Amino acid sequence: MTTCEIEMATRGQVNARRNYLMGLWAGRMLGMGDRELPGYVHEVMRSDFEEPGPGDVVRKVSRDLASRGRKISEEDVLKQLQVMEKSVRSELLSTD
């Protein structure tokens, strides 16, 4: 299997895991506890189905952070999302 074929086969997994991690990160930034966090993570993951690309996730997280006084720019949220995506890709493409 070529790298391109692996990339196409794992794209959905990468996005789902990236969004899961983004939800955890943002939820913790919002001060959510163990009871609230799973629901919020699910909301973040669902937000990715609004439009192609990560923009919908970035906007949701940015709005949520701003609504609780956490002023983090969309650019910084996008950078965090990109770091998470890179990490997830490394995990999925690594071999034992």
Description of each model-found segment:
Residues 1-96:
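A charge-rich, low-complexity, intrinsically flexible signal that marks solvent-exposed coils, linkers
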